[in-house]
Amino acid sequence: MSKRDYYEVLGVAKTASESELKVAFRKLAMVHHPDRNPGDKEAEIKFKEVNEAYQCLSDGQKRAAYDRFGHAAFSQGGAGGPGFGNEFGDFMSDIFENFFGDGRAAPGGGAGRGRGGAPGRERGSDLRYNLEISLEEAFAGKTETIRIPTSIACETCSGTGAKAGSKPRTCSTCGGYGRVRAAQGFFAIERTCPNCHGRGEVVDDPCTACSGAGRVNRERTLSINVPAGVDDGLRIRLAGEGESGMRGGPAGDLYVFLSIKPHPFFQRDGADLFCRVPISMVTAALSGEITVPVIDGSQTQVRIPAGTQTGKQFRIKSKGMPVLRSREVGDLYIQVSVETPQNLTKRQRELLQEFDQSASDENHPESAGFFSKVRDFFVSGATRA
């Protein structure tokens, strides 16, 4: 069967640039790769055809020979048929590693390249710990002792997984690389070694303490420094305090996620604190002093001027939360709420009625002004009608 024109195979014009050839090749390689079309012989043939066409046209000398003589340039005795040398294999390895994510080797390429360093060494998993603290603890900072279940390196075998007096041997299937290459006709695919499962080593006599895993489950006790000024949702990273790595690999990290309990008095907004304080009608009308709490456990006095209304806010400087890793401190805001008297005695009712009868608009400027505006609104509306 005659070969198809290489430009036709890649779907490009004879004047295609090097970048256009590369784009076309990558697109077709993804479509026809055997791992994406298992058992599809037609896809396998097309994949070979695409590889062959690209290797020829991406090489300046071979392309010039092909443009002049066609496929005859690579027949026996000619310039040499397309093959996959190491330099092309390296390029293909990069392409397929990016496309398929597992470091598959390219057709005819050289030795594959591992993604995790030495075969068998695995980084330990990261761990998460949720820690709830009070607002007072967030204000002052604290050292918290926590206990976490985790996996640590087996002390009996020092993490090797092998019984005392023995040691793991290099996997004979992959030669310690952790991956094997399987030839499929014109190309080769690199996969995780089925014998050692990518570890590069095999344990013939496993440690009885860890059953060959190299790690054992334990509960660890750690001290965590919670700095003053932390906020809800803050994450603290403790490097190397996660699970131990496998077979000498590095340990993972521990992430502590902080949450702050709701406070009965204070609401927080950044470094500022807000506290709602009820005051009596008499204090609001005649003035007075009230005692309010402070987050550090102390108390302070706030002067309430005569005629204070509900919602009035008083600022107390530097009585809020500290700013994390700073010398700055937020403020405390006291918002008053005037309480209406309840359960009045007969005499109290009489006194209030007497006050109401003697009161004028000057005593209630806000309500008097409001009802005056309402009256004017309806009067003007009736006039327009």
From Swiss-Prot:
Zn(2+) 2 binds at residues 171, 174, 193, 196. GO terms for cellular component: cytoplasm. It is found in: Cytoplasm. Binds 2 Zn(2+) ions per monomer. Its cofactor is Zn(2+). GO terms for biological process: chaperone cofactor-dependent protein refolding; DNA replication; protein refolding; response to heat. InterPro entries: DnaJ, DnaJ_C, DnaJ_domain, DnaJ_domain_CS, HSP40/DnaJ_pept-bd, HSP_DnaJ_Cys-rich_dom, HSP_DnaJ_Cys-rich_dom_sf, J_dom_sf. CXXCXGXG motif repeats lie at residues 154-161, 171-178, 193-200, 207-214. Gene3D superfamilies: DnaJ domain, Heat shock protein DnaJ, cysteine-rich domain, Urease metallochaperone UreE, N-terminal domain. SMART domains: DnaJ. Coiled coil: none annotated. Zn(2+) 1 binds at residues 154, 157, 207, 210. A zinc finger (CR-type) spans 141-219. Its main location: cytoplasm. GO terms for molecular function: ATP binding; heat shock protein binding; unfolded protein binding; zinc ion binding. Residues 5-70 form the J domain. Keywords: Chaperone, Cytoplasm, DNA replication, Metal-binding, Repeat, Stress response, Zinc, Zinc-finger. Participates actively in the response to hyperosmotic and heat shock by preventing the aggregation of stress-denatured proteins and by disaggregating proteins, also in an autonomous, DnaK-independent fashion. Unfolded proteins bind initially to DnaJ; upon interaction with the DnaJ-bound protein, DnaK hydrolyzes its bound ATP, resulting in the formation of a stable complex. GrpE releases ADP from DnaK; ATP binding to DnaK triggers the release of the substrate protein, thus completing the reaction cycle. Belongs to the DnaJ family. Homodimer. The J domain is necessary and sufficient to stimulate DnaK ATPase activity. Zinc center 1 plays an important role in the autonomous, DnaK-independent chaperone activity of DnaJ. Zinc center 2 is essential for interaction with DnaK and for DnaJ activity. This is Chaperone protein DnaJ. It comes from Methylorubrum extorquens (strain PA1).
